[in-house]
Amino acid sequence: MEIKWLHLKSFRNYQDQEVDFRPGLTILQGENGQGKTNILEGIYYLLTGKSYRVHREQELARWGENEFHLYGDFIVQRRKLRLESHYQDKRKIIKINQIPCRKLSEYVGTINVVFFSPDDLVMVKGGPAERRRFLDLHIAQHHSKHIQLLNAYNKVLQQKNALLKQGQGGSKSQIAQIELWNEQILRIGSEIIRNRWEFTGLLSRKGQEIYGQISSGKEELTMDYHALGKNNLEEALAAFPKLLAEKMSLEMERKMVLIGPHRDDILFKLNERSARLYGSQGQQRSIVLSTKLAELEVIRQEKGDYPLLLLDDVLSELDRFRRDYLLDYTKSLQQTIMTMTSAETLTQRASLLLKVEKGQIGRIE
């Protein structure tokens, strides 16, 4: 998978900018605040329909503008694809080869991408919501139906929460309505749990192998998906309906939904100890690096091709051994795009070196 050309219009600090890319390693060089990360964000948004930095599309528009437009030419298994994403009048329009997509699920996963930045450390150090978001974003690239499941589940969750907030003191009418919503939570939630569990298993096996190489076999990495307090899939699915019934009174008392995949978590462990609680900063960075590279391998196995890799100033956060490991790894990929403040030590590795300054992009010969 490869990007050939990108056009950003009224996106972030870019008024109207086009960029041509090459296979191999592209380095975007420039001082902080010049727009390097915005290029990666534009590519990521174009491929996933989402930003990894903000939740509101309006924040992506250039200052003083109410719209933005993104275009990109890609090669996927020798096929040429033109992707477009337009935000205008508070509406998002996405197109593949000029044909509008009715749903985001028709679009996501057409071209796969893996993004890695220092902020990804939150995947280990942060809360369960950050880890669920990581899983869901990347499952969606493999299985477009997962987006539909998440949207449907969130709607049911909102409806049940609204019902619980009404109170009604556990009347027969309220209980009957809660039971109806519980049926939907059970049906949709079980599919979400199964998808997350399967993806975590694939990721864990590959991540364990890569982490072993990074740590020279000194530590063993495991990733366990915990659903409904269980670390076994069949046990979790069997307990789901029982927990929904048992916790109904407590949910009515607290006026919020307490049971479902919206409260699940993925646990990273080193030698059976919590990496979040006991891992050093270096170990936690190694876990994130291993997980991201494992994700690349999982996509390659499923799609038959490596995804596009975007690296946002990650080398400065890694020690020399891990930095060299990552750079050597990128040699096997079709294309990697990386941001740096200075690329002096990597000019021989790069197939394309670009200078980014004040929203302008130029080649460095």
Swiss-Prot record:
Classification of source organism: Bacteria, Bacillati, Bacillota, Clostridia, Eubacteriales
InterPro entries, sorted: DNA-binding_RecF, DNA-binding_RecF_CS, P-loop_NTPase, RecF/RecN/SMC_N, RecF_2
Keyword set, alphabetical order: ATP-binding, Cytoplasm, DNA damage, DNA repair, DNA replication, DNA-binding, Nucleotide-binding, SOS response
Entries under PANTHER family matching the protein: DNA REPLICATION AND REPAIR PROTEIN RECF (PTHR32182:SF0)
Organism: Desulfitobacterium hafniense (strain Y51)
Record's function text: The RecF protein is involved in DNA metabolism; it is required for DNA replication and normal SOS inducibility. RecF binds preferentially to single-stranded, linear DNA. It also seems to bind ATP.
Protein name according to UniProt: DNA replication and repair protein RecF
Molecular function per GO: ATP binding; single-stranded DNA binding
Binding site for ATP: 30-37
Top-level taxon in the UniProt lineage: Bacteria
PROSITE patterns: RECF_2 (PS00618)
One GO term of the biological process aspect: SOS response
Protein localization: Cytoplasm
Family: Belongs to the RecF family.
Coiled-coil annotated residue ranges, if any: none
Cited Gene3D superfamilies: P-loop containing nucleotide triphosphate hydrolases, RecF/RecN/SMC, N-terminal domain
